């Protein structure tokens, strides 16, 4: 056997040895499925696992995370969108296979499409103007997401040529026209320190929501002062003897909360060694034992404050604002521009948007408020539905209430028992003892505690 063949076989062996081992158990908890992931420690592996679970629309109710030397053990209690445990055997097998291969078999991503990344100052009707420009330039929007936060907007849009269905980035003149017109729309207000940013690229496998977090982070949306009474409660304390910084968070529970927090810690180069996450009614409590990638805990007060601000911003970006409108109809050229124009003409601001097209069916979600960020008069919503189509546009709950009810049922807690958890706004419930107790029971702690 040649040396190169030996090397290839060795590499395959290493990959097989380091592939995550997944156990999915439906017998432990009455209302949730337990997903246990045992894996070799590597940069970003926790984020990949959380990302995969959230991309499958699984609600993470509780989690215990620990590393011991070169190995990780992550335990997630998950449910579906209705708050029920997973019973579909095909789905369970798919989750196992996806987690076991996700770290070594990357997806192809958005091949055959052109990616547009936009960052700028938010204003009423901006997204409507963006989609109108793309329609005029015969660019079909296949998938897009847009977030707004602290007066800023970040969006990632995948487009193709409206006639040929091919990427547009092969035509440099057309790309320049697209960039130029979008940049004019996104020009920052006078005196704002950050420039408008646009970027055109081909395909790629960038996770859209992680990229939006990165765009907002680069745009420093976290620097604006937060409303203390409404902001997530975040504290950062050092444990000098153990060499960790302990990050505690308390906020309203919602889908993808853990992903948003872990994504931000990862992008800020903090490594999670141990963590515990739990929910009490509508409130989520998260605790992380972290170090910076240089091996040190948080080393200064400015760094501590910046970490707190960035985590608060990461949670707030996805916080539901306004009324959720869902559009489901046959796709056609200019549909998105037409629908958003009607919203703009009725004085509605799009606080968040999720656009997708599959098999010639457009499925779009808009979170809308009035121009001042307040709730909308129901009569205006009724008028808009009549213009767009009663059967095509519907008003939905922001998130399924049944998920919260399932958590309360599992924990035998009445909703009113935890209404005052935010009282005072300064005291966090420490999960330190909970972390250690569960990690000892799992046999995962040897030297860290």
UniProtKB/Swiss-Prot annotation:
One Pfam match: ACT
Xref: Gene3D superfamilies: 3.30.70.260
Name of the protein: ACT domain-containing protein ACR7
Gene: ACR7
Keyword tags: Repeat
Tissue occurrence: Expressed in roots, leaves and stems.
InterPro entries membership: ACR1-12, ACT-like_dom_sf, ACT_dom
Native species: Arabidopsis thaliana
General function of this protein: May bind amino acids.
Superkingdom to which the source organism belongs: Eukaryota
GO biological process terms on file: cellular response to hypoxia
Domain ACT: 34-112, 115-197, 246-322, 324-404
Source taxonomy: Eukaryota, Viridiplantae, Streptophyta, Embryophyta, Tracheophyta
SUPFAM superfamilies named in the record: ACT-like
PANTHER family associated with the record: ACT DOMAIN-CONTAINING PROTEIN ACR4-RELATED, ACT DOMAIN-CONTAINING PROTEIN ACR7
Induction summary: By cold stress.
Any one annotated GO CC term: cytosol
GO molecular function terms listed in the Swiss-Prot or TrEMBL record: amino acid binding
């Amino acid at each position: 056997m040649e040396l190169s063949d030996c090397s290839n076989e060795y590499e395959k062996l290493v990959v097989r040895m380091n592939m995550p081992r997944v156990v999915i158990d439906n017998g432990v908890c009455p209302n949730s499925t337990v997903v246990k992931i045992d894996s070799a420690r590597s940069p970003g592996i926790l984020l990949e696992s959380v990302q995969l679970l959230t991309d499958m629309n699984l609600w993470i109710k509780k989690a215990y995370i620990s590393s011991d030397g070169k190995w990780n053990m992550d335990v997630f209690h998950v449910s579906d969108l209705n708050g029920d445990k997973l019973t579909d055997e095909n789905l369970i097998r798919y989750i196992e296979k996806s987690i076991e291969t996700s770290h070594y078999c990357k997806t192809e991503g958005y091949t055959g499409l052109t990616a547009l990344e936009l960052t700028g100052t938010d204003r009423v009707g901006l997204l409507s103007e963006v989609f109108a420009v793309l329609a005029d330039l015969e660019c079909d929007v296949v998938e897009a997401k847009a977030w707004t936060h602290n007066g800023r907007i970040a969006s990632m849009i995948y487009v193709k040529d409206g006639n040929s269905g091919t990427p547009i980035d092969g035509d440099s003149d057309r790309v320049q026209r697209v960039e130029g017109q979008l940049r004019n729309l996104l020009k920052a207000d006078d005196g704002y320190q950050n420039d408008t940013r646009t970027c055109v690229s081909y395909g790629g496998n960038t996770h859209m929501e992680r990229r939006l977090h990165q765009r907002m982070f680069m745009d420093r949306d976290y620097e604006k002062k937060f409303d203390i009474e409404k902001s997530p409660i975040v504290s950062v304390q050092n444990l000098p003897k153990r060499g960790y910084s302990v990050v505690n968070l308390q906020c309203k529970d919602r889908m993808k909360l853990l992903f948003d927090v872990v994504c931000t810690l990862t992008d800020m180069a903090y490594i999670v060694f141990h963590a515990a996450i739990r929910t009490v009614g509508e409130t989520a409590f998260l605790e992380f034992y972290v170090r910076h990638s240089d091996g040190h805990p948080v080393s200064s007060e400015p760094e501590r404050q910046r970490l707190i601000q960035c985590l608060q911003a990461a949670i707030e970006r996805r916080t539901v604002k306004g009324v959720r409108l869902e559009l489901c109809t046959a796709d056609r050229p200019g549909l998105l521009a037409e629908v958003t124009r009607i919203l703009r003409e009725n004085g509605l601001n799009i606080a968040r948007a999720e656009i997708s097209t599959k098999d010639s069916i457009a499925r779009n979600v808009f979170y809308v408020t009035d121009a001042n960020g307040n709730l909308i008069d129901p009569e205006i919503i009724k008028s808009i539905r009549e213009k767009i189509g009663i059967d095509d546009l519907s008003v939905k709950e922001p998130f399924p209430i049944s998920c919260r009810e399932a958590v309360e049922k599992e924990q035998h807690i009445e909703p009113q028992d935890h209404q005052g958890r935010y009282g005072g706004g300064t005291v966090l419930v420490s999960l330190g003892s909970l972390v250690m107790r569960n990690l000892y029971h799992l046999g995962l702690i040897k030297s860290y505690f």
